[in-house]
Amino acid sequence: MKLNLRPAEECTFDAVSLGEVMLRLDPGEGRIRTARSFRAWEGGGEYNVIRGLHKCFGMKTAVITSFADNEVGLLMKDFIEQGGVDTSLICWKKTDGIGRLCRNGLNFTERGFGIRGAKGCSDRANTAISQATPEDFDFDYIFKNKSDGGLGVRWL
């Protein structure tokens, strides 16, 4: 298999990912069901890869995702930006404030300890990205080279 890299000068990003980014809530050393406080993180399979490419190799990366347009969505955007990943390709979805239109995904993960394995559960029903359509993102513009009027992505 041949890796096809576009010239860097033709591309805004080295790599992008498409997928759900959830708010990860970590109860520390305790259990989810008894915790009274949680540490918040961002996470998601595709996003974790793109963040790692930026952090480990200094690549210019972006995430293509969708969030409910509310304070939790803005918090997740801020977490992504703190990780050095570009957020300009996020699609913001209207929300009604109670989750009927859309919401942001939540992931609860407790750490393994000794012989007890890690445990987690996700609350992903009706999330903004699950309702996204191809029309929500201009893929032609994202993947077209800069000289052709697009953003350009090196890795295809």
What are these regions (language model features)?
Residues E10, R33, G44, L101-R103:
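A generic fold-level signal
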Residues K60-L156:
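Conserved N-terminal subdomain of the carbohydrate kinase-like
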